[in-house]
Amino acid sequence: MVTGELKSKIDNLWELFWTGGLTNPLDVIEQMTYLMFIRDLDDADNVHAKEAAMLGLPYKSIFAGEIQIGDRKIDGSQLKWSTFHDFPAAKMYSTMQEWVFPFIKNLHGDKESAYSKYMGDAIFKVPTPLMLDKIVTTMDAIYEQMEQIKSADTRGDVYEYLLSKLATAGVNGQFRTPRHIIRMMVEMMDPKADEIICDPACGTSGFLVAASEYLRDRKKQEVLFDRQNKEHYMNHMFHGYDMDRTMLRIGAMNMMTHGVENPYIEYRDSLSDQNTDKEKYSLILANPPFKGSLDYDIVSADLLKVCKTKKTELLFLALFIRMLKIGGRCACIVPDGVLFGSSTAHKAIRKALVEENRLEAVISMPSGVFKPYAGVSTAILIFTKTGHGGTDKVWFYDMKADGFSLDDKRTETKENDIPDIIERFRNLDKETDRKRTDQSFFVPKEEIAENGYDLSINKYKEIEYVPVEYPSTQEIMTELHEIEMKIGEEMQALEELLGLN
């Protein structure tokens, strides 16, 4: 988490953009992202050069010699952050605008890397030399502070903090699934080193980043020290799709700042015929758009066969089933209406999950989880694609607290069910004897089917009413008489004190 002096410096950097005339938070994030990458490029090049020297291996810097930019050849060292950050403001500005930006836009000539795809149409928007000079100085101070912290997570935390400002500013708040909820879902799914992971509505790539961090932290030896697994992790494991190009660029950069070199983040309308993915992924993690409505003619025909509806939350569930391999797993967030909606489409998608696949868990979340951006009640569905059923019983959990207050302030609290949810889900064999009055319990498939495939926890949860015992009428009347006598005695004492008798 970003706190103290580092947080203050990032806020100052944001303020520099804001007061300088860049008032669209998406533009600010984009420009910061580009500048972070330009600085990182210099740092990474220096690290690689030192490593090569220590090992006695040859190394050619990407800044070595003369570099062709347009119709001119430039001394490559001038493109290094460590060189141009000492230039006078006007020279630094012209260097950045005329040389550095064109250089990084064409850095990967293969056009297939995530970097080249999202930098290809990058535009330098810092309006004045003086503003750029202040930004570069502030960024140097931020990086110096990050080095003092000496934590592998700091880079990612800084970027997450920047992304949180999108939501704070009221822009694209719908893309912000709370980080602790994302992490809980990833922990429950426990990704493996050979997964192919997808988020078909990825936004800023929060789920993909969390999955990559989980693998780095929990399975580092297996993922990063095995050549084949590392190549898969860096280039083939993570797939994300979205319809907002700016969010795609930010999402791709988010992945790269968290150490994934070449994520497959692409512009795509996941629900349309444009998306032909079928039985491709082993794990889907998603929080698809709620309450959207689409025309039938732009929705993929095979999704409408599963449930004929215009509701995006139902269509995305049908899509997840189609995109998963047999044996593939999904953890996704849905609005409560998906669980109990009475329309034909609602029932059809729930039936498909229960009867044609293996629905494993329904975690009901309190309505304040998405505050202050939305007060909608939601749940997490976890299922495995089988294509032939397999649901025996479904595990339900009633989350009452997520570690934060459920009002608009969302301040940290001690009440937190998340560790308990993860622990219980990982030990489902110990859950079989729980009663319907407990916070979690199993419900047999037959009972769910009898109830129209209703998946709302309140349909099955039993509330234990503890009878309240009241004193007898005689006891109450006796107590009232005693109170009355005491009042009379005290009134008499007061009158004597005041000399009224």
Predicted regions and their residues:
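DNA target-recognition domains and sequence-specific DNA-contacting regions of bacterial/archaeal
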Residues: Y281-N287, S293, I321, I463, ...
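C-terminal, active-site-flanking charged/polar segments
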Residues: R358-L359, K371-I421
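Conserved nucleotide-binding/hydrolysis micro-motifs of P-loop NTPases
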Residues: D42, T204, R245-T246, S272, ...
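Hydrophobic alpha-helical scaffolding
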Residues: Q148, A201, G240-D244, L283, ...
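Non-catalytic, mostly N-terminal accessory regions of nucleic-acid modification and defense proteins
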Residues: M1-A193, Y264-N275, S364-G368, G390-S405, ...
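Conserved Class I SAM-dependent methyltransferase catalytic core
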Residues: V28, M32, M243-I250, I265, ...
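Conserved S-adenosyl-L-methionine
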Residues: V171-A286, K291-D295, D302, K310, ...
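Short acidic (Asp/Glu) and glycine-rich catalytic loops that position anionic groups and cofactors
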Residues: D11, T137, E231, E261-I265, ...
